[in-house]
Curated annotation (Swiss-Prot):
Assembly notes: Homotrimer.
Organism listed in the record: Pseudomonas aeruginosa (strain UCBPP-PA14)
Gene Ontology terms, MF aspect: N-acyltransferase activity
Broad enzyme group: transferase
UniProt signal peptide: none
Pathway where this protein functions: Bacterial outer membrane biogenesis; LPS lipid A biosynthesis
Domain of life: Bacteria
Record-linked Pfam families: Hexapep, LpxD
Keywords, comma-separated and alphabetical: Acyltransferase, Lipid A biosynthesis, Lipid biosynthesis, Lipid metabolism, Repeat, Transferase
NCBIfam families in UniProt: lipid_A_lpxD, PRK00892.1
Catalytic center residues: H242
Protein name: UDP-3-O-acylglucosamine N-acyltransferase
Function text: Catalyzes the N-acylation of UDP-3-O-acylglucosamine using 3-hydroxyacyl-ACP as the acyl donor. Is involved in the biosynthesis of lipid A, a phosphorylated glycolipid that anchors the lipopolysaccharide to the outer membrane of the cell.
Length: 353
């Protein structure tokens, strides 16, 4: 049976620096949406489309901006950014188990590996020769940490994460189950139709405060390291090929695929299913919408898309048929433009006479 986490509203207000409008002693035992929250839960209004649920919400208190709070008769925590405040408070109610320091008896740790005494190594984990595990790191069951790999302080690896050899991970990095970091890049040379493997002798370097989702793969570099900057957030099932570079605080949604040696700038956002060809660059502050195929470098900040938007199937079939006729339509248009130009030129000559 789970124990109940409980804070007073005053404690929560102090945690996020909120203006409290209501009873500071009100007990709060969780977070919930405006529609689902009860009297012992805190909710928030961050998206205007949910404002319609505010008057009827049963939440014990609501995180609101000053503008929304002025028209609200209930208990509120007034903040500049309700969503950011919610993000901060969510950690107070997080029930993720905290592993105790120490090495499980079934774990296999090389004699020359370094594991900080405050780190936790789970059941059947393997830590190979020369690896270094920093202070407060939590390594889940069945993880493999390859030779000479380094995990910075405060890192958290869910069960069954695999780090190959010579992977360097910064501080406070979270990696979800099934992720594989440092696998061999897809590199081959062709000799008369036969593929000859190229040894991938680079590594992977990951900065601080990075999050890597379940079943995401980051390949090691062919020569130099694949580089992931500070604060990068990677969703589940992302594929990052060898020698890719990702700038600080860039975020990617699920199923993004990035080909080798592509370089992505800082503060970019790639929505789900985006694909990048290799050896191109994306500048800072670029947003790429879902399922876009990026085939050339992007040199100006902004939002980019490719493909066609969803439409009813019957209309899409008509559009697809018209696409097949574009070449013929373009030729006919050129012919009409030439005839129009000839008629216009003839008319001008007649008026001059």
């Amino acid at each position: 049976m789970m124990s109940t986490l409980s804070y007073t509203l005053g404690q929560l207000a102090a945690h996020v620096g909120a203006e409290l409008r209501g009873d500071a002693d009100l007990p709060i035992q969780g977070l919930a949406t405006l529609q689902e929250a009860g009297p012992a839960q805190l909710s928030f209004l961050a998206n205007p489309q949910y404002r319609k649920y505010l008057p009827e919400s049963r939440a014990g208190a609501v995180l609101l901006t000053a503008a929304d709070a002025d028209g609200f008769s209930g208990t509120a925590l007034v903040v500049a950014n309700p969503y950011l405040a919610y993000a901060s408070l969510s950690h107070l109610f997080d029930r993720k188990p905290k592993a105790a320091a120490g090495i499980h008896p079934t774990a296999i740790v090389a004699a020359d590996a370094e594991v900080d005494p405050s780190a936790s190594v789970g059941a059947y984990a393997v830590i190979e020769s020369g690896a270094r595990i920093g202070a407060g790191v939590s390594i889940g069951a069945h993880c493999v940490i390859g030779a000479r790999s380094v995990i910075g302080e405060g890192g958290w690896l869910a069960p069954r994460v695999t780090l190959y050899h010579d992977v360097t991970i910064g501080a406070r990095v979270s990696i979800q189950s099934g992720a594989v970091i440092g696998g061999e890049g897809f590199g081959f040379a062709n000799e008369k139709g036969v593929w000859q493997k190229i040894a991938q002798i680079g590594g992977v370097t990951i900065g601080d405060d990075v999050e890597i989702g379940a079943n995401t793969t980051i390949d090691r570099g062919a020569l130099s390291d694949t580089l992931i900057g500070n604060g990068v957030k990677l969703d589940n099932q992302i594929m990052i090929a060898h020698n890719v570079q990702i700038g600080d605080h860039t975020a990617m949604a699920a199923c993004v695929g990035i080909s080798g040696s592509a370089k992505i700038g800082r503060h970019c956002m790639l929505a789900g299913g985006v694909g990048l060809v290799g050896h191109i660059e994306i500048c800072d502050n670029v947003f790429v919408t879902g399922m876009t195929m990026v085939t050339r470098s992007i040199t100006e900040p902004g939002s980019y898309s490719s493909g066609t938007a969803m439409q009813p199937a019957a209309e899409w079939k008509k559009s697809a048929a018209r696409i097949r006729q574009l070449d013929d339509m373009a030729r006919r248009l050129q012919q009409l433009e030439k005839r129009l130009a000839a008629v216009t030129s003839s008319g001008d000559a007649s008026s001059d006479a």
